[in-house]
Amino acid sequence: SNLKEIRSSIWLDLIFVNISNNEISFDKYIKPLSDRWEKFWSKKDRKLIVHSDDYGYFNLNAKCNWKFAIENYCESYHLPWVHPGLNSYSKIEDHYHIQGLPNRFAGQGTTVYNPRLKGKGKFPCFPNWPKNKEHIAEYVALFPNVMLGVHKDHFYSYWLEPVDHKYTKEHMEIYYVGDKAANSKKYKSLRKENHKLWKGVQSEDVDIIEGMQEGRNSPSYNGGNFSPVMDNPTHHFHKWVVTNIV
């Protein structure tokens, strides 16, 4: 056959494919992010993630280039205007920048994560998540097209499927700690609510990134400027694009 072998790896239930023979191994590529998250969850904890069969997936369509979705995910600058509900309890000033070195990922973290689910029910947490970090959650874009969210009680991967230069399919996969949290009737209402929350938040971004696509087509657009205070992670991604794609 004419099939050619390509390198692939599985990490956090995601399959990563590398068609370039001149790139480093995936283990080396992912090590900076994996090491960073060791302070939250151990390797044993990571093995506990289970995908939810009922409320573990949704997809969104965006009429824009995939890179705008990554740009948007990297920064918290837009929170007050795009996500007023989220910003009411996780304000822009509660976030911090993440700039992975070497330049392979970037994003933001929050210091006030506190699940806003109805009633007294709560999801089980990762057993080794430090008590002094229980209100920390991190949202990282792993270049080129994967967005990740790690919390004490659930994890998600939000990956982009570029259809063409101005149309992108977004796929959200949600995981919980153990099969009981992910699939039992006991936690079904909580899963439904968490699913609704994340779909609502991510849907709020679609109009914005589609507007970014339209804005780039304006003859008045001159390339734009980065905020030296708020756009550091986004600038990190732009540097990756220049180095690896352009």
What are these language model-derived features?
Residues S1-K4:
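Active-site glycine-rich loop that binds ribose-phosphate moieties when present
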Residues S9-I10, L14-V246:
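C-terminal catalytic domain of Rieske-type non-heme iron oxygenases
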